[in-house]
UniProtKB/Swiss-Prot annotation:
This is Gamma-glutamyl phosphate reductase. It comes from Ectopseudomonas mendocina (strain ymp). PANTHER family: DELTA-1-PYRROLINE-5-CARBOXYLATE SYNTHASE, GLUTAMATE SEMIALDEHYDE DEHYDROGENASE. Pathway: Amino-acid biosynthesis; L-proline biosynthesis; L-glutamate 5-semialdehyde from L-glutamate: step 2/2. It catalyses: L-glutamate 5-semialdehyde + phosphate + NADP(+) = L-glutamyl 5-phosphate + NADPH + H(+).
Amino acid sequence: MTESVHAYMTRLGQAARQASRVLARASTAQKNRALQAAANALDAARAELTAANELDLAAARASGLEPAMVDRLALTPAVVDGMIEGLRQVATLPDPIGEIQGMRYLPSGIQVGKMRVPLGVIGIIYESRPNVTIDAASLCLKSGNATILRGGSEAIHSNQAIARCIQLGLAEAGLPAACVQVVETTDRAAVGELITMPEFVDVIVPRGGKGLIERISRDAKVPVIKHLDGVCHVYVDIAADLDKAIRVCDNAKTQRYSPCNTMETLLVHQAIAERVLPPLAAIYRDKGVELRGDAATRALLGSDVLEASEDDWFAEYNAPILAIRIVDSLDAAIEHINHYGSHHTDSIITEHFSDARRFLTEVDSASVMVNASTRFADGFEYGLGAEIGISTDKLHARGPVGLEGLTSEKYVVFGDGHIRT
């Protein structure tokens, strides 16, 4: 690259801003055609995708990247099938753009409502998994937003090959190639440029490790949709159904260990602890889950439960490790969650409506649940069709961010020569 990173990113930003204006007025049929054509292009380019991905995999192995990270890079036939299906599925989702809601007549005679509109240009910064390129591009395209995608340097060849397929789809639908752009430099300065271009970029969505997200949140000059941690809790209330508690707590921890909606801390009311914790501990031990508990938990379950430190209550393990605390009240459980949690997803197991209602009202998290596993905190499971990530912020979007979360609203007013008096 002969031009500077600043000049290159400025050029991408300018092109994205221009393309966003075209995409904002594109019809639903045009956007769906682009998505379907991109899916067909991916299907036809399997050999090219494999060749590009092999370059990334070889470089990753040579650099000593951890095997788990190498696995995340792989574009296996199943992963490519998933990307193709993802594009086609997004094409079937309802288009939120242009929808007008809440129209009402006011005493002055005017009609006022709200129209859903795109955000504009969205910058996506992510690591490792090249299939995120498809997830992000498809949702941004369907919601009428141009996007600039900056994937990890370890997936550069894969991301470029995927982007070429997307742009074939855009061309077939008569949309500008700049609707979806992949940053083609691996220079880390490109990230710094992308997050400090408010004249071209309206929102940043980072997907990656805590360090990446903290840096972007600190340095960005545009709004960021993010979550830092997934410290999720299940609280087994005094009025819990035992079978439900065991089933939910098992699933919330052991279905998968790495997702951000996996339970990391289990809270149990002291009055039910002797009935629920021993059978749960047996399940966890059989599945190789390391248990860390407070003094009451260790006294009940035995010395093989490690002593939980203060850091454990804040921990997102992403591993077969679980922290357990016995509490004396619903108040104590809510206080613990709001103090130590990450405001992601928390669940109560109870048969008391009043306790459930208090939990839903007082726990300050993006998703709060009753008698359900935290693993349900997902855009697909919520009926959103797909998600670009999960936000624990209170502005602009909160929880799983699907198509609607990538839009904004503007007021629309209809009159018939009305003037204000």
